[in-house]
Structures are given as C-alpha cells and as structure tokens.
Amino acid sequence: MYKEGACLYRNPLRSKSDVKDWRMEGGGQISFDDHSLHLSHVQDEAHFVFWCPETFPDGIIVTWDFSPIEQPGLCMLFFAAAGIRGEDLFDPSLRKRTGTYPEYHSGDINALHLSYFRRKYAEERAFRTCNLRKSRGFHLAAMGADPLPSPDDADSPYRMKLIKDKGYVHFSINGLPILEWMDDGSTYGPVLTKGKIGFRQMAPMKAVYRDFAVHQAVRR
C-alpha cells in the first residue's frame, strides 16, 4: 500500500557523535558497544525518553533495528509529538518533562505512542501485546499480538517499520503486520500530523537500536 519515498532523515546510531543533538528526558544513559546504540537506566525506576531533534512532517515511514537485551521493562516509540497548541516539542513554554509517563500522556503535549515490547509487569509478560495509544489523554487506539521473544531467545536485530499517513497508522516487525488503525479525527480528537520521534524505555529494560531512518510515505 505504501513504499518509501525520499529519505528525510537517516542515522546509523553507531557512535556518540551520531546522537550529539538528541535530547534525553529522564534517567537514561547511552553507550555504543558493538557500534550500536545501547539504552539503559541510571537507577531503579529511572524511565526516560530519548528524542531525535528533527520535526517530521506527516506522511512518513519510520524504520529501525531493535534488539532486547534485558527485561523486565518496556520499549515504546513516540511519534507526531508536539505541544497541544502546535508548539515545537522543545518549546521552553512547555512544562519540563522528566521521563514520568503521565507527563507525556496527560500533560501539555500531543503524541502517538507505540508500545512494541511490553514486559514491565507480570500481566504484560503473561499475555504479550503491542499497544498504540493517542494523547493528550490515555486513549488505547489499537492492539496487536507481540511476536518478539524474551531476550534470552531473541534472534536479533528485529526490523521495525511504522507507517503514519494522516489518520492511518500501520506497524510491522520483520515484515509481519502487527497492528493498524485509522484515526477518524473525532473520537480521540483531531488527527495528529507533524512532530518529533523519541524512544522510550521503562527501567530496568536494556535494549539496542541501530539504523534509524525516516522516509516519505508514498502510496503505491
């Protein structure tokens, strides 16, 4: 249905210089073992979001390689993130964010958030799903089965692919469709368009990321 058009942003995530302009909110730390971005927590319960500095338009395909290293924890992607009045996500008029989840789903920003590795709590590990939510608010928009194994059994990396075009959202892992959703623009508020993208983790999760890219989404 969609193919990749022009490349809007590409980052191999292989060295510290690749993320020198990225912004950390909360208690996260980065390292670059094996020429890949390793994200982990500074201390217990130190959840965080690591933001790409670019503001992306609507109509995009987002791809990245993901490898789970240690659980429990949770991995999420924020996208189409901006202030509730259209401000840039880093506008100084917005309240300071420190990695605490309510700041992101019930604060002064709008965003879509895709939880694609939910292993923080026992009930999440017992019945694994990928969840798509829309904020402001804590609106569960779509769910899909999570095919990713526990870190000990992982054959990493896994290729993650997210399509966002107006109200349409589609997510797949290694080419396997996981969930899709069409935002009607009224049930949970207006359709979100341009905004920033960030990786969120909940401690004590450790994970590895590589080859992050954003392309224009072109309808076939």
UniProtKB/Swiss-Prot annotation:
SUPFAM superfamilies: Concanavalin A-like lectins/glucanases (SSF49899). It comes from the Bacteria. Pfam families: DUF1961. InterPro entries: ConA-like_dom_sf, DUF1961. This is Uncharacterized protein YesU.
